Amino acid sequence: MSSERAQFAAEVAEVERWWKSPRFARVNRPYTAADVVSKRGTIKINYPSDVQGKKLWKLLSEHAKNGTPSHTYGALDPVQVTQMAKYLETVYVSGWQSSSTASSSNEPGPDLADYPSNTVPNKVEHLFMAQLFHDRKQREARSRMSDAELANTPVIDYLRPIVADADTGHGGLTAVMKLTKMFVEKGAAGIHIEDQAPGTKKCGHMAGKVLVPIQEHINRLVAIRLQYDIMGVENLVVARTDSEAATLITSNIDDRDHPFIQGSTNPSLPPLNNVMVEAEAQGKTGDQLQAIEDGWIKAANLQLFPQALAQALANEGASRSTVEKLVARVSRLSWPQAVAVAQKEFGLKQVPYWNWDAPRTREGYYRYQGGTECAIHRANAFAPYADLLWMETKKPILAQAKEFAAGVHAVHPGQWLAYNLSPSFNWEAAGLNAQDMQAYVWELGKLGFVWQFITLAGLHSNAYISDLFAQNFAKTGMKAYVELVQSREREIGCDVLTHQKWSGADYADSLIKTVTGGVSSTAAMGAGVTESQFTSKL
């Protein structure tokens, strides 16, 4: 065997040993270690995000063992990241927030993932570079402390693992892999990716969501894992499903999606698209077209195929219990499988009219009936390829979270779950009292939701203090700044009160003095710096 072949074989064996570690006990890969090694370069690169990924895995493993959650929120900037580091274990980077505040094109907009694909990775880098800087700054400051000062000054872990929003992957499988590579290079410990179609992606709490087939999303998850493996990192992937509230799907090609696709049960209706094209040709627009579509949908009596089969069997005289058994038997079967079972096992004589093509939209999408059962079905299909599973929901309903967790854990015991504590929910109108709200994240933790996050808390907290301060500053001038900001910073011990020190001026002085032999007449924090005023109230 040539030395090149021997080196290749040795690396393959190393990857195979790596995959047998507890870290990947629940991970399924449809490719081999040789596939991975053949796609690597000859220079081994060590990525800081791998350290962060391992740290995140260890953190969540401990929470899973204890039935507790790690909860966080979406950070906008380095200021928020440094303040979060004192109290929270992870950092979230939101695509929604990036879309409105940090697009790499500088063009803001809603959460449609129509910003350049490097937008969220760039925000991750922005925050990760700040984490690294404040970690260095702290270490330098502690190196100058006495033993007593060290003992009385808690260490802040600025290097909190970052989990970021990969939307739908921004394109095909190679686009997903390139996006994943950017996230690894920029410092993300993990990413989440959702099962929406890329061209029509919406915020999880908007209408009009279009799903992709189950296998298409599995392919995305596999692409992420493959890219991780090629780079030799243990970063995490979160599989999100938007199927709880989805109403459309791009294709009926995947048998596993069949039970949730709706069809027309009215044989007298022409296809909806034909009706709409004809109406447009007649000059109808806007509300007129919407009324025509609404009327067609009502007349079509859309049903899932198991429902149509159940009605047909009942019409043929079957008992209620027999019909219920049929529904239970075919509820997760493909269309041809359901027909075969209904005929052979239940004696159905006539297959009912049921047409899933007739209601298709002008874009060609199929009508889809989402819900919690659907989300469980999809999550269970994604589980072997993801580290965590997330069902996007419309409201903070603990009973629904319990149903989802039970449905997943019945198939995949111990599977880690994630939960969006969304600010899109009207929490005050959710039927939760103050005690319920305080306990919510910990109750979810008991169910296996080991990682939870408020996607836009950074945005909302920023908006809140900005509005409050601007309003009062306009009326009362510096009194507003002192009362709402400076005195409150001092009261809670916020380190940004002394913003020169927070920004690293002492650290920069130390760098300069290291270069110049310990003396600098231009030290930023020398005599005359106004920050010395903050040693006491004026």
UniProtKB/Swiss-Prot annotation:
Binding site for substrate: 94-96, 204-205, 240, 420-424, 455
Motif (Microbody targeting signal): 536-538
Active site per database record: 203
UniProt: Mg(2+) binding residues: 165
Region entry Disordered, spans: 98-117
Keywords from the named record: Glyoxylate bypass, Glyoxysome, Lyase, Magnesium, Metal-binding, Peroxisome, Tricarboxylic acid cycle
Pathway annotation from the record: Carbohydrate metabolism; glyoxylate cycle; (S)-malate from isocitrate: step 1/2
Superkingdom in the source lineage: Eukaryota
Catalysed reaction equations from the record: D-threo-isocitrate = glyoxylate + succinate; (2S,3R)-3-hydroxybutane-1,2,3-tricarboxylate = pyruvate + succinate
Transmembrane segments: none
GO biological process terms on file: glyoxylate cycle; tricarboxylic acid cycle
Presence of keyword Iron-sulfur: no
SUPFAM superfamilies: Phosphoenolpyruvate/pyruvate domain
Localization of this protein: Glyoxysome
Function noted in UniProt: Catalyzes the formation of succinate and glyoxylate from isocitrate, a key step of the glyoxylate cycle, which operates as an anaplerotic route for replenishing the tricarboxylic acid cycle. Required for growth on ethanol or acetate, but dispensable when fermentable carbon sources are available. Also acts on 2-methylisocitrate.
Subunit structure: Homotetramer.
Family: Belongs to the isocitrate lyase/PEP mutase superfamily. Isocitrate lyase family.
Name listed for the protein in its UniProt record: Isocitrate lyase
